[in-house]
Amino acid sequence: MAAIPPDSWQPPNVYLETSMGIIVLELYWKHAPKTCKNFAELARRGYYNGTKFHRIIKDFMIQGGDPTGTGRGGASIYGKQFEDELHPDLKFTGAGILAMANAGPDTNGSQFFVTLAPTQWLDGKHTIFGRVCQGIGMVNRVGMVETNSQDRPVDDVKIIKAYPSG
């Protein structure tokens, strides 16, 4: 297993080169340091390369980060699921919010989502750890692709390459 980077390693952004364009994500290290480290390090290791946005719900969110593409896979850099980092100042107030997908409290792994609209019912249930700082138009276009009855895109939308800045 690769070493976990030191606490001093805090790249401000992660870039997602997708089959539909580039998304630049700003990370909220002050509010969710463990989650940011997990996401940035998985990106640095190439974990997200070649994965797809496996769940897309119009006017709600786009979800990715599962190497199996099923919505049931993925692991953190910590070797297991890890705890939520819920911050009272961070709310699901609009489009472009980056958060961890989970299966209940303290079940974070590698899957993440980006909101397409305000989703206040998620406040206090998912760790918010960043936002889209470039490419929100591209995120919105991903949110409009045709999906099947299980919210899976008919045509794959892939993360070709993910990498941290610096």
Curated annotation (Swiss-Prot):
Instruction: Give the matching Gene3D superfamilies.
Output: Cyclophilin-like
What EC number(s) does the entry state? 5.2.1.8
A single Pfam family it belongs to is Pro_isomerase
Q: Which residues bind cyclosporin A?
A: 54-65, 70-71, 99-104, 109-113, 119, 125
Impact upon substituting G109C: In PCH14; uncertain significance
- On whether Nucleotide-binding is a keyword of this UniProt record, the answer is no
Q: Which reaction does it catalyse?
A: [protein]-peptidylproline (omega=180) = [protein]-peptidylproline (omega=0)
- Activity regulation here? Inhibited by Cyclosporin A.
Q: Which residues carry this modification: Phosphoserine?
A: S149
In terms of one coarse class, where is the protein primarily found?
nucleus
Q: Which GO terms describe its molecular function?
A: disordered domain specific binding; peptidyl-prolyl cis-trans isomerase activity
Q: In which tissues is it expressed?
A: Ubiquitous, with the most abundant expression in heart and skeletal muscle.
Q: Which GO terms describe its cellular component?
A: catalytic step 2 spliceosome; nucleoplasm; nucleus; U2-type catalytic step 2 spliceosome
Tell where it localizes: Nucleus
Subunit structure, as described in the record:
Identified in the spliceosome C complex. Interacts with SNW1/SKIP. Interacts with CDC40/PRP17; this interaction leads to CDC40 isomerization. Interacts with RBM22.
- Return the protein name: Peptidyl-prolyl cis-trans isomerase-like 1
Tell me the organism: Homo sapiens (Human)
Upper lineage: Eukaryota, Metazoa, Chordata, Craniata, Vertebrata
